[in-house]
């Protein structure tokens, strides 16, 4: 149960997995839960932070993979950090947000720090008319879009011309 005395899948999962959380991880999880985000976005950000999405690098730990290259840019090993920050397709998605955001402006060397920087963005990241909540929601939408594109390529064998497709206007929230 969470603080309001109501049972939820999220609170049960949090309780059953509490032994795995570090103090810093607990703080991030608390910050995610305090945001006005759909649970799907919360879980996506949490999975990215903990590097537990089934990326090529993650799957290769469990079984031998034919390739672990990023399916979007095919230039580096597919990790959460690469897929959501360093991949050229991800950079284009971030920049096309309507705010012209450069994801490189977030100082993150791992996926946990990336999500931490999104949930608690540094002052230089937020613009005058953009609240923290708007920024986090935009970031969650962009990451969800990147994950969806990735899954279309990997799971549905779709051939996507990333230079020809317009990215969504994520600033309309």
Residue map of PLM features:
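Charged boundary/loop elements
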Residues: 1-173
